[in-house]
Curated annotation (Swiss-Prot):
Its EC number is 4.2.1.11. One of its GO terms (molecular function) is magnesium ion binding. InterPro entries: Enolase (IPR000941), Enolase-like_C_sf (IPR036849), Enolase-like_N (IPR029017), Enolase_C (IPR020810), Enolase_CS (IPR020809), Enolase_N (IPR020811). This is Enolase. NCBIfam families: eno. Component of the RNA degradosome, a multiprotein complex involved in RNA processing and mRNA degradation. The active site is at E216, K349. The keyword Metal-binding applies. It catalyses: (2R)-2-phosphoglycerate = phosphoenolpyruvate + H2O. The lineage of its organism: Bacteria, Pseudomonadati, Pseudomonadota, Gammaproteobacteria, Moraxellales. (2R)-2-phosphoglycerate binds at Q174, K349, R378, S379, K400.
Length: 438
């Protein structure tokens, strides 16, 4: 329920938004929610490079004279006027009601009017202010929203080679990741991933390859094939004494929508090699059989549901098949995938849907139906580390927040280290993939 009395210490007394810069040097929106007792909750909206067509709308100004059209003054104005007026004197602890009020105020299916970035920044700032007002860490406040009693530390998906839309190189597959599953704590898993990251740098240098990094902090060398990215990572794992397939598994984010043209999957970096839907599925199946790949994200185009069905039938019992562009954190679309037995996991991105409450709806719908959940950053990030708290507070099981460099990525890992020390939540490692036989 909303609080009626304006002197309630948890009443919202002001909301302020501003333009800030994200990790790619593009504007994004940051919002402050200020309570009657002076408590401030602050949050920023991230931004993606490869985006699903059914994501909620990120409102940009389109004014080419400012930030090349990417300014967010309209979104800022929407927060400082319409959203502020609608939420003044409301009880900040009424997360669902506040999110519902913003959704109703917008009045569109994909938040066209106010912008998902405007709504999300306020939604997350509300949660942070509410947590502070109750003297709760954010992860615990999020857990309490859905009566999540057991907290776990997530297995990190560490993006150590960038390609596709995240780098200016010859690699088509967007992300090559490692998942340190064979460890007893998050801190030890993070250490292993960091050691492999530095080992990979030395492997690349020894082969005369570029060690500059992409949007998410992974290395972005020009390679002869996508498979070569896997082989250099395997060398890096071995070089520091870990066992691939036991201590460390591999994961891919193909972002296949980005190279799907006219019904064909075209690998430009491999001489425009072309596959039909079944052919590219078989290509991925072959990689998963040859290498210790535990997870494949967006292996097919978001509209290629027949291809997804085929891929799920081929390896869905052995490999985690993650829908990102496929599901866009939308409970209705996820339900369709569940009904059709498409994929077996969902990537969770706040800004694809636009509120914390809707994000939680997607997470718990997935959990209820046996789908794995991976909390994710975007390629355009800020120092905001809310996703770390979300991963723990929902016991999501996995988190995807980039490589082991760039402070916008490391901020999330560091927050997880703080949480682990504070709550001593368990790190389940390989048990997070217990449904897979591979």
């Amino acid at each position: 329920m909303y609080a009626e009395e304006t002197n309630n210490v948890t009443a919202i007394k002001d909301i302020r938004a501003r333009e800030i810069l994200d990790s790619r040097g593009n504007p994004t929106i940051e919002a402050d929610v200020i309570l009657a007792d002076g408590t401030i909750g602050r949050a920023a909206a991230p931004s993606g490079a490869s985006t699903g067509s059914r994501e909620a709308l990120e409102l940009r100004d389109g004014d080419k004279s400012r930030y090349m059209g990417k300014g967010v003054k309209k979104a800022v104005a929407n927060v400082n006027s319409q959203i502020r007026s609608a939420l003044m004197d409301k009880n900040v602890t009424a997360q669902q009601a506040i999110d519902d009020a913003m959704i109703a105020l917008d009045g569109t299916d994909n938040k066209d009017n106010l912008g998902a970035n405007a709504i999300l920044a306020v939604s997350l700032a509300v949660a942070k202010a509410a947590a502070k007002s109750q003297s709760l860490p954010l992860h615990q406040y999020i857990a309490d929203l859905r009566n999540q009693t057991s907290l776990t530390m997530p297995v990190p998906m560490m993006n150590i080679i960038n390609g596709g839309e995240h780098a200016d190189n010859t690699v088509d597959i967007q992300e090559f990741m490692i998942e340190p599953v064979g460890f007893s704590s998050f801190s030890e898993a993070l250490r292993a991933g960091t050691e492999i990251f530095h080992s990979l740098k030395s492997v690349l240098k020894s082969q005369g390859l570029n060690t500059a990094v992409g949007d998410e902090g992974g290395f972005a060398p020009n390679l002869r094939s996508n498979e070569e990215a896997i082989t250099v990572i395997m060398q890096a794992i071995e070089q520091v004494g870990y066992t691939a397939g036991k201590d460390i598994h591999l994961a891919l984010d193909c972002a296949a929508t980005e190279f799907y043209k006219d019904g064909k999957y075209i690998l430009a970096g491999e001489g425009n090699k072309s596959f039909d839907s079944q052919g590219f599925s078989d290509y991925l199946v072959g990689l998963a059989r040859q290498y210790p790949i535990i997870s494949i994200e967006d292996g097919l185009d978001e509209s290629d549901w027949d291809g997804w069905k085929y891929l799920t039938e081929q390896i869905g019992d052995k490999v985690q098949l993650v829908g990102d562009d496929l599901f866009v954190t939308n409970p209705a679309i996820l339900q369709e995938g569940i009904d059709k037995h498409i994929a077996n996991a969902i990537l969770i991105k706040f800004n694809q849907i636009g509120t914390l409450s809707e994000t939680l709806d997607a997470i718990y719908l997935a959990k209820k139906n046996g789908y794995a959940t991976i909390i994710s950053h975007r390629s355009g990030e800020t120092e905001d580390s809310t996703i770390a708290d979300l991963a723990v507070g929902t016991a999501a099981g996995q988190i995807k927040t980039g490589s082991l460099c760039r402070s916008d990525r490391v901020a999330k890992y560091n927050q997880l280290l703080r949480i682990e020390q504070q709550v001593r939540a368990s790190y389940r490692g390989r048990e997070e993939f217990i449904g897979l036989r591979g």
